[in-house]
Amino acid sequence: MAGQPSHMPHGGSPNHLCHALGPAPPPDPQRLPNTLSFRCSLADFQIEKKIGRGQFSEVYKATCLLDRKTVALKKVQIFEMMDAKARQDCVKEIGLLKQLNHPNIIKYLDSFIEDNELNIVLELADAGDLSQMIKYFKKQKRLIPERTVWKYFVQLCSAVEHMHSRRVMHRDIKPANVFITATGIVKLGDLGLGRFFSSETTAAHSLVGTPYYMSPERIHENGYNFKSDIWSLGCLLYEMAALQSPFYGDKMNLFSLCQKIEQCDYPPLPGEHYSEKLRELVSMCIYPDPDHRPDIVYVHQVARQMHVWTSST
C-alpha cells in the first residue's frame, strides 16, 4: 500500500494513549519483531466485559488505568492465524491506521504484543450497529425512510473519503462494521485489517460468513482496490433500502452467489419508495468493471446533496 511507514510511530506521538514503557528486549526470531514493547501492557487496563468475538479475536470493554478512559481492547490470536510476513504487514497497517483522525472513524489508540497476542486499543463504540437497525426495520415490516438512509450514508462516505485520501482501503465495509451512537453519529470500525484476520471478506470454503459484499474482482482474485470499497458502499446503500443484501438468496451456494455477483443480478429497488438518485447511485457503485465505478469523492458529493434535499422536504 502506498505511503506505509516502515515501522510503527513512536510512543511520544500525541495520538498514543499510553506512555513509553522502557527499552525493548532483543527480538526473538520466532516471534513478531517487538517494535511495540514501549506501548501499553495488559497491566494498564482493567478489563470489564467481553463485547464481541471473531474467529481469531475477542473484544473487551476496558478502562485504561493511566487516564481512566473507557476503551475497547481487541485481543487477536495473531500467532495462530498468519505467517511472519503477514504479522509484520499487519503491524505496519496498524501504524497507518493510527494516523487516521475523523469523527466518523473509530480511532486506533494503541497496540502492543503480549502473551503471544496482538492487543489493539480502540475508541469504544458503545452503541448499536447498522445491521441491528436493518434487522429492526425488517422485523417491523417497515422500510427505512430515505431521509434516514442518507443521514447515515453521508457520514459513512465522509469516513471512507478520509481513508481513501490517505491511501487507506477499508476492505470490509458492511452494516455490522458501521456503528451508530445514541446521538446518531456514525462510527466506521474494523478498518483495513480484514485481509489479516477476517474470514468473512474472503471466498470462504463454507457458507459460514458468506461474502455477500464480495466484488467481481475478488472472485477473479484480481486483488482489492479502492473501487472495491465503492462496490461495498453500493451494496450497503442497497441493503439499507431493501433490508437485505443485493445478492442474498435462500439455499444459495457459493458458486451461484458468485454468478449473481459477476452478472450484477439483483432485484431492483422499489421506485415508489426511493428516489431515482438513490437507485442510480446503487447501480453505479454495484458495477462489474471497477474502472467504471465512481470514486468516493463523487459518491460523497451525491450523498451530501441528497442528505440536504431529503432533510429539507
Swiss-Prot record:
One of its GO terms (biological process) is protein phosphorylation. Belongs to the protein kinase superfamily. NEK Ser/Thr protein kinase family. NIMA subfamily. It comes from the Eukaryota. Interacts with NEK9, predominantly in mitosis. Interacts with KIF11 (via C-terminus). Interacts with APBB1 (via WW domain). Interacts with ANKRA2, ATF4, ARHGAP33, CDC42, CIR1, PRAM1, PTN, PRDX3, PIN1, RAD26L, RBBP6, RPS7, RPS6KB1 and TRIP4. Interacts with STAT3. It catalyses: L-seryl-[protein] + ATP = O-phospho-L-seryl-[protein] + ADP + H(+); L-threonyl-[protein] + ATP = O-phospho-L-threonyl-[protein] + ADP + H(+). Residues 45-310 form the Protein kinase domain. It comes from Mus musculus. It is an enzyme of class 2 (transferase). Displays an autoinhibited conformation: Tyr-108 side chain points into the active site, interacts with the activation loop, and blocks the alphaC helix. The autoinhibitory conformation is released upon binding with NEK9. GO terms for molecular function: ATP binding; DNA-binding transcription factor binding; kinesin binding; magnesium ion binding; protein kinase binding; protein serine kinase activity; protein serine/threonine kinase activity; transcription corepressor binding. Its cofactor is Mg(2+). The keyword Metal-binding applies. Residues 1-44 are annotated as: Interaction with ARHGAP33, ANKRA2, CDC42, PRDX3, RAD26L, RBBP6, RPS7 and TRIP4. Keywords: Apoptosis, ATP-binding, Cell cycle, Cell division, Chromosome partition, Cytoplasm, Cytoskeleton, Kinase, Magnesium, Metal-binding, Mitosis, Nucleotide-binding, Nucleus, Phosphoprotein, Serine/threonine-protein kinase, Transferase. This is Serine/threonine-protein kinase Nek6. Protein kinase which plays an important role in mitotic cell cycle progression. Required for chromosome segregation at metaphase-anaphase transition, robust mitotic spindle formation and cytokinesis. Phosphorylates ATF4, CIR1, PTN, RAD26L, RBBP6, RPS7, TRIP4, RPS6KB1 and histones H1 and H3. Phosphorylates KIF11 to promote mitotic spindle formation. Involved in G2/M phase cell cycle arrest induced by DNA damage. Inhibition of activity results in apoptosis. May contribute to tumorigenesis by suppressing p53/TP53-induced cancer cell senescence. Phosphorylates STAT3. Residues 267-270 are annotated as: Interaction with APBB1. It is found in: Cytoplasm; Nucleus; Nucleus speckle; Cytoplasm, Cytoskeleton, Microtubule organizing center, Centrosome. Highly expressed in the liver. Autophosphorylated. Phosphorylation at Ser-206 is required for its activation. Phosphorylated upon IR or UV-induced DNA damage. Phosphorylated by CHEK1 and CHEK2. Interaction with APBB1 down-regulates phosphorylation at Thr-210. ATP binds at I51, G52, R53, G54, Q55, F56, S57, E58, V59, K74. GO terms for cellular component: centriolar satellite; cytoplasm; cytosol; nuclear speck; protein-containing complex; spindle pole. InterPro entries: Kinase-like_dom_sf (IPR011009), Prot_kinase_dom (IPR000719), Protein_kinase_ATP_BS (IPR017441), Ser-Thr/Tyr_kinase_cat_dom (IPR001245), Ser/Thr_kinase_AS (IPR008271).
